[in-house]
UniProtKB/Swiss-Prot annotation:
Name the UniProt record assigns to this protein: Response regulator GacA
DNA-binding region: 166-185
Gene: gacA
Organismal lineage: Bacteria, Pseudomonadati, Pseudomonadota, Gammaproteobacteria, Pseudomonadales
Any Pfam family: Response_reg
4-aspartylphosphate, modified sites: D54
Residues spanning the signal sequence: none
Result when mutating P90L: In the spontaneous pleiotropic mutant BL915-1
Gene Ontology molecular functions: DNA binding
Disruption phenotype: No longer produces the secondary metabolites diacetylphloroglucinol (Phl) or pyoluteorin (2 antifungals) or HCN. No longer protects tobacco plants from attack by the black root rot-causing fungus Thielaviopsis basicola. 50-fold decrease in expression of hcnA. Greatly decreased expression of genes controlled by this two-component system such as aprA, hcnA, phlA and pltA. Loss of expression of small RNAs (sRNA) RsmX, RsmY and RsmZ. Loss of the autoinducing signal (which is unrelated to N-acylhomoserine lactones and induces the Gac/Csr cascade).
Length: 213
């Protein structure tokens, strides 16, 4: 039996995935988590074999959660699930150790296939994302300015885009407000911007966030 943990900040998504997988032979959803932080606690408590990890969540987010999770539980297989097909997320999640990558447009059969393959020690990348990664490999240079940012800088940039205040970011990441502001100015400098509004527009333009949200 493959033990699965579902991680997503939207209750409707978590419930939907859990219900879809409930009738699949050989799979058991052992729990749900609504944030990256909670996924770390649930993984320790429930000992899943596979984690379906939403990429864009408040707090530490799926990228940082994957990195932390695999550092403490290297045998767990993480399948990233996101609405975003554009870099830098697919590349960064795979570099962080994710064994699979799905879009939220994936059907039940594809999701089950991904879970079973990564559990068996293989990788699974959805066709759309695989195609995008192949095309990118032939490009002489990156088209996304966000590739210049570190994982921590991307994490903080997305929290800023999500309208989270400096003190909230500070509390969630266990950093001082001064350090958060230092990251913020460094992000602005690397992206050649000067405001949170410009950061948000740039993030939308390069597929870092869903423009409809």
């Amino acid at each position: 039996m493959i033990r699965v943990l579902v991680v997503d900040d939207h209750d409707l998504v978590r419930t939907g995935i859990t219900r879809m997988l409930a009738d699949i032979d050989g799979l058991q959803v052992v729990g749900q988590a609504e944030s990256g932080e909670e996924s770390l606690l649930k993984a320790r408590e429930l000992k899943p074999y596979v984690v379906l990890m939403d990429v864009k969540m408040p707090g530490i987010g799926g990228l940082e959660a994957t990195r932390k999770l695999l550092r403490s539980h290297p045998d767990i297989k993480v399948v990233a699930v996101t609405v975003c097909e554009e870099d830098p997320f697919p590349t960064r999640l795979l570099q962080a150790g994710a064994a699979g990558y799905l879009t939220k447009g994936a059907g039940l059969n594809e999701m089950v296939q991904a879970i079973r393959l990564v559990f068996a020690g293989q990788r699974y990348i959805s066709p759309q994302i695989a195609q995008q990664l192949v095309f990118k490999s032939f490009q002489p240079s990156s088209d996304s300015p966000f590739d210049a940012l570190s994982e921590r800088e991307i994490q903080i940039a997305l929290m800023i885009v999500g309208c989270q205040k400096v003190q909230i970011i500070s509390d969630k990441l266990c950093l001082s407000p001064k350090t958060v502001n230092t990251y913020r100015y460094r992000i602005f400098e690397k992206l050649s911007i000067s405001s949170d509004v410009e950061l948000t527009l740039l993030a939308v333009r390069h597929g870092m966030v869903d423009a409809s949200l």
